[in-house]
Regions:
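Single conserved hydrophobic/aromatic residue that forms the stacking wall/gate
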Residues: 1-9
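Substrate-recognition element of Asp-dependent hydrolases with the DxDx(T/V) motif
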Residues: 10-34, 46, 86, 126-131, ...
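Hydrophobic/aromatic beta-strand patches that form the interior of the parallel beta-sheet core
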Residues: 21, 43, 185-187, 204
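Substrate-recognition/cap helix-loop segment adjacent to the acidic, metal-dependent catalytic center
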Residues: 26-43, 133-148
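Structural recognition of alpha->loop->beta junctions
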Residues: 35-54, 123-124, 216-217
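Glycine/small-residue-rich loop that forms an oxyanion/phosphate-binding "nest" at active or ligand-binding sites
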Residues: 43-45, 55-69
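Conserved acidic, metal-coordinating active-site core of Asp-based
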Residues: 74, 79-187, 191-199, 208
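Asp-based, Mg2+/Mn2+-dependent phosphohydrolase catalytic module
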Residues: 199, 204-220
Length: 220
C-alpha cells in the first residue's frame, strides 16, 4: 500500500479505540521502516524492553552477566563469531565479516561501532544478535544455558534471556492498559513471532511467513 493509505487505515483503526503496537527484535533507535506511522507502544528486542509511546519504558529485562562471561569464555577458548551487543542507549559489535556486512546492507541497518568483546560486561545488555549458522547453533547455545535463540534469518539469530520473547512483552503491555489476551490480534512472519502468534487471541501468519509459524497460526 502507498504510505498515505497505510497511515489513513491506521488512523481509522485507532479512531475506533483499537490500540496498535509494534513487536520487533530491533532496538527502538534502529526501527527505520515505519515511515511516519504512529503507534501506542513498542515491544522491542524480542520483549526485553517495552515502551508506551516512544519514551516511557514500562519493562526491562537484561541478559544475566554470567551468560556474557560464558560467551566471552567460549569465544576465547573454542570459536569466534561476530556478535552485536544491544544496550539501552547504543550497541556495538566485536568484529565484522562478510556475513555481517551483507546483513547490514540487506536490512539497511547502521553498522555498529567495533569494540572489544570484554566491553559487554561493563554495561547491561538486553539482547545479542549473533552471527552463527543453524548448524553451529546447538553447540554454541549449550554454552549459554541462561539464554535462548530466536532465529528469523539463516545468517544470524537473536539471543535473549531464557523465557524472554515477544509474548512476554505483549503481556506487559496488556497489563498496563488492562486489555485481556482474548481481545488481541497479532501478525507475524518470522520465527521470533511464534510465541506472540500463539499467545494472542487471534494469531495471523503473513503469506511470506516460514512454515513453522504458519502451522501454529489461526489464519494465514
Amino acid at each position: 500500500l502507498h504510505s498515505t493509505s497505510r497511515r489513513q487505515r491506521q488512523m481509522c483503526i485507532r479512531d475506533r479505540g483499537i490500540k496498535v503496537f509494534i513487536a520487533t527484535g530491533r532496538h527502538l533507535q534502529v526501527i527505520n521502516n515505519l515511515g511516519d506511522l504512529e503507534f501506542d507502544g513498542y515491544v522491542t528486542l524480542n520483549g526485553s524492553c517495552c515502551y508506551i509511546g516512544r519514551d516511557r519504558v514500562i519493562y526491562r529485562r537484561m541478559i544475566p552477566e554470567i551468560a556474557l562471561e560464558h560467551l566471552i569464555k567460549y569465544q576465547e577458548e573454542k570459536e569466534t563469531f561476530p556478535c552485536i551487543f544491544v544496550r539501552e542507549k547504543d550497541m556495538f559489535i566485536n568484529y565484522n565479516n562478510q556475513h555481517t556486512r551483507e546483513v547490514f546492507r540487506m536490512l539497511d541497518f547502521p553498522e555498529p561501532v567495533v569494540k572489544d568483546i570484554h566491553e559487554a560486561t561493563r554495561e547491561g545488555v538486553f539482547q545479542l544478535i549473533a552471527f552463527f549458522s543453524e548448524q553451529q547453533e546447538d553447540r554454541i547455545m549449550q554454552a549459554l544455558p541462561e539464554c535462548e535463540a530466536t532465529r528469523w534469518n539463516p545468517l544470524f539469530t537473536d539471543v535473549v534471556p531464557v523465557g524472554g520473547n515477544k509474548s512476554i512483552g505483549m503481556e506487559k503491555i496488556l497489563a498496563y492498559f488492562g486489555i485481556s489476551r482474548e481481545e488481541t490480534m497479532a501478525f507475524g512472519d518470522g520465527g521470533n513471532d511464534i510465541p506472540i502468534i500463539k499467545r494472542a487471541g487471534i494469531g495471523i501468519a503473513m503469506g511470506n511467513a516460514n512454515q513453522d509459524l504458519k502451522e501454529i497460526a489461526d489464519y494465514i
